[in-house]
Curated annotation (Swiss-Prot):
Belongs to the thymidine/pyrimidine-nucleoside phosphorylase family. PROSITE patterns: THYMID_PHOSPHORYLASE. Disulfide bonds: none annotated. One of its GO terms (cellular component) is cytosol. The lineage of its organism: Bacteria, Pseudomonadati, Pseudomonadota, Gammaproteobacteria, Enterobacterales. It comes from Salmonella typhimurium (strain LT2 / SGSC1412 / ATCC 700720). This is Thymidine phosphorylase. The enzymes which catalyze the reversible phosphorolysis of pyrimidine nucleosides are involved in the degradation of these compounds and in their utilization as carbon and energy sources, or in the rescue of pyrimidine bases for nucleotide synthesis.
């Protein structure tokens, strides 16, 4: 039998906690036998003293085991259970293409996703722009869709990693969110509860990233790869660029439209293609569906070219109660904003920098995201035809097309876009889409 205050004292004094001590504390968070004050105290001691790798693995697995852990063995699936997690960005619509692409190559992708957070868009919010789309199928239906279609994207239910929800709520109000062991545990507890064979992490870097510097993004990626492999799940991470909006659009319906166009081959933004392909390659290799990069890319290109990936996306939408002809008739179903017009820069030059976070917040301000959990989302608003770093801007080339609910909202967004995009008289050096691959 342990005492919560003794566990806090031990960590406060700089000692490593045992697996049993960590499990006792996390189970107490779940069972409400540990107070909010005690959670806050432990979070702060971890913030200042960090955690060893064994402690980080124990924390993550204890949070995973605080609720249901999905088990796919009874389905006798003929491929690996694989998933991707992103730290979030703007125009980061990769999940909508990646899930179907990997499923079309023989993987099974039970993606438990999130809503928008701060300036970052949420995959669930994007999918809810599709009429009827059900993000909370019951457990049996979720399993059926995975078995039949190969991919489902759903919201987190209360049975998955429940200790994390309470732990995170306390961290949020005690300035202990930005602790690498605690971020790692929070992300991985939910992902590992999916019962995965392999995972790829997309850790963003730059002005729209969750972590403020390249070094911190790198440290988070290394921590996640170390802990997830320590917990028995083959995991790699990619550091990818978020110094500009990833897709050509940012919003909900506008990003779903771009995802369908990507899958059908109607339009593929080059940077979005690079990042999506790189993440899919990791999933195929870690899931042992391809032996190397070249084989993985060939398989992925084939399912894009032969329409199989688009077909899987359509089947997923239908299985989750969306329209059965969504891929063919997406424009009929997706909401469109009352006002759509381009915004132009006041001067000419090359785009040298972008405040991606500010662009994400501009979408939220237009109604495309939530400032608080109770807010309703306007799925139609956002940006399309986003200009990119290095583009030459003059009176002909707009910075973006803004889709707004009215003129006042358009004007406010136009001001934000102009302020967030910096022009210079010479073009900047190009930045890679993927900076680094991190393995154990």
């Amino acid at each position: 039998m342990f005492l919560a205050q003794e566990i806090i004292r031990k960590k406060r004094d700089g000692h490593a906690l045992s697996d049993e001590e960590i499990r006792f504390f996390i189970n107490g968070i779940r069972d409400n036998t540990i107070s909010e004050g005690q959670i806050a105290a432990l979070a702060m001691t971890i913030f200042f003293h960090d955690m060893t790798m064994p402690e980080r693995v124990s924390l993550t697995m204890a949070m995973r085991d605080s609720g249901t852990v999905l088990d796919w063995k009874s389905l006798n699936l003929n491929g690996p259970i694989v998933d991707k997690h992103s730290t979030g960005g703007v125009g980061d619509v990769t999940s909508l293409m990646l899930g179907p692409m990997v499923a079309a190559c023989g993987g099974y992708v039970p993606m438990i996703s999130g809503r928008g957070l701060g300036h970052t868009g949420g995959t669930l919010d994007k999918l809810e722009a599709i009429p009827g789309f059900d993000i909370f199928p019951d457990d049996n239906r979720f399993r059926e869709i995975i078995q039949d279609v190969g991919v489902a994207i759903i919201g987190q239910t209360s049975s998955l990693a429940p200790a994390d929800k309470r732990f995170y709520a306390t961290r949020d109000i005690t300035a202990t969110v930005d602790s690498i062991p605690l971020i790692t545990g929070s992300i991985l507890a939910k992902k590992l509860a999916e019962g995965l064979d392999a995972l790829v992490m997309d850790v963003k870097v730059g002005s729209g990233a969750f972590m403020p510097t390249y070094e911190l993004s790198e440290a988070l990626a290394e921590a996640i790869v170390g802990v997830a492999n320590g917990a028995g799940v083959r995991t790699t991470a990619l550091l990818t660029d978020m110094n500009q909006v990833l897709a050509s659009s940012a919003g909900n319906a506008v990003e779903v439209r771009e995802a369908v166009q990507f899958l059908t081959g109607e339009y593929r933004n080059p940077r979005l293609f690079d990042v999506t392909m790189a993440l899919c390659v990791e999933m195929l290799i870690s899931g042992q569906l391809a032996k190397d990069d070249a084989e993985a890319r060939a398989k992925l290109q084939a399912v894009l070219d032969n329409g199989k990936a688009a077909e899987v996306f359509g089947r997923m939408v239908a299985a989750q109660k969306g329209p059965s002809d969504f891929v063919e008739n997406y424009d009929k179903y997706l909401p469109t904003a009352m006002l759509s017009k381009a915004v132009y820069a006041d001067t000419e030059g090359f785009i040298s920098a972008m405040d991606t976070r500010a662009l994400g917040m501009a979408v939220v301000s237009m109604g495309g995201g939530r400032r608080q959990a109770s807010d309703t989302i306007d799925y139609s608003v956002g940006f399309t035809d986003m200009a990119r770093l290095g583009d030459s801007i003059d009176g002909q080339r707009p910075l973006a097309v803004i889709h707004a609910k009215d003129e006042a909202s358009w004007q406010e967004a136009a001001k934000a876009v102009k302020a967030a995009i910096i022009l210079d008289d010479k073009a900047p050096a190009s930045t890679p889409s993927v900076y680094r691959r991190i393995t154990e």
